[in-house]
Every structure is written in C-alpha cells, then in structure tokens.
Amino acid sequence: YQEAVVEFDRSGNITDFRFALDAQTAESMERCGDVASKEQRMIILQYVERFRTAYNQKDINTIEKMFSDDALIITGKVIIARQGTDQFSFKPKVQYTKQNKAQYISNLRRAFLRNKWIDIKFSQIGENGETSGCSGITRSRKNKNMFGVRMRQSWKSSNYSDEGYLFLLWEFPENGGDPIIHVRTWQPEYVGG
C-alpha cells in the first residue's frame, strides 16, 4: 500500500495531494541533518514528497516549475554491457548525461511517454551507504536559503529500473515562496567523503 498526504483549506477543499515518504525516511529527516529549524525540516519533507509525487504522476508541468532556469542536472542510466567475448558475461556500466533544464524536461517528457507507469521511492541513507543512518540534509554556510538533500532513490517503470543516490540543491526564498532546485545529480552508489 502507499500512504498519501492530503491538505485542506478552511472550507474543506483539497489544496494539495502528495504521496508520503515512508515513516523511516520521515523520521530520519526529522532527527538528522544540519537544518535550522523544525519548520524548515517539515517544509523540506513536504517538497521532497511533492517532487516524488510529480514524477509518479508524470506531472511534467510541476517538475518544470521546480527547477531553476539555469539548473545543472546530471542524470545517469545503467547499461548492461557484454564483457569480452563471453556471451553470458555482462557488466553494468553507468552512462552520465549533463543537461540544462530544457534538455532535461524534453528527455523526461519522452521517458514519460515511453513508460506506462513510473514508481519512484525515496529512502534514507546512512554513513557510507549503510542502512539505519541519517538522510543527508545540509545547509549552505554561504547562503542560508540553500539546502542540499541527499537520499536513496528507487526508480521503477514499465521498461527501466535502477537504484542509486539522488542529490538535490534547493533554494528556499526568503519571501516564503516555493523553493527551486538548482542542482540535481544521480549516482548508482554512495561515494563517502
């Protein structure tokens, strides 16, 4: 089953619907990371849920609004290549692509059309990729409105699947408006620092 979050206005009208992160990820985001306040953690959690929901619903307009016009986007896909002359020996290889917002949205539109369904899930990550650690949320020391959010991503669709780690650099405007993503990167495995 999948949990969802529904928000209502004072008149009882639905103002927002999004798929909820699993309880373990939400708890990890609550207790971990160098985030200024509980309010900011809740806002980050809400936007991560909206981000995931937009992909699962193939809502290209919402995704496009979430990215800065000058966003740096690095995507990766796992390609299975034959190793040597042995027809039964295959080795996974990752192909990375650096894109701007227009290229990414165009490629994502095609991916949405190619797939009957998409199911993205985010989960926590720990030290060196181990389980039961904290999801990574860091606040920029130079710009207090910038937050890096790191999480494990499981991408499953009707014709492709992979697992890896996603990093999003969000800017939360001082005026309280919707945050925008300046950087989105993906890698197949955790690289510790």
For the regions a protein language model found, what residue spans apply to each?
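Surface-exposed, charged secondary-structure patches
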Residues: 1-7, 86-163
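Acidic/histidine-rich, surface-exposed loop or edge segments in extracytoplasmic proteins
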Residues: 29-32, 80-92
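Amphipathic, hydrophobic N-terminal targeting peptides for secretion and organelle import
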Residues: 1-17, 187, 192-193
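Sec-exported extracytoplasmic/periplasmic mature domains
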Residues: 52-56, 68-72, 109-117
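Short, well-ordered alpha-helical segments enriched in acidic and aromatic residues
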Residues: 59-83
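Short, low-complexity N-terminal intrinsically disordered segments enriched in polar/charged residues
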Residues: 12-57, 61, 65
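Short, solvent-exposed aromatic-acidic interface loops
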Residues: 18-28, 152-157, 182-193
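Short, solvent-exposed coil/turn segments at beta-strand boundaries
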Residues: 6-14, 142-144, 170-181
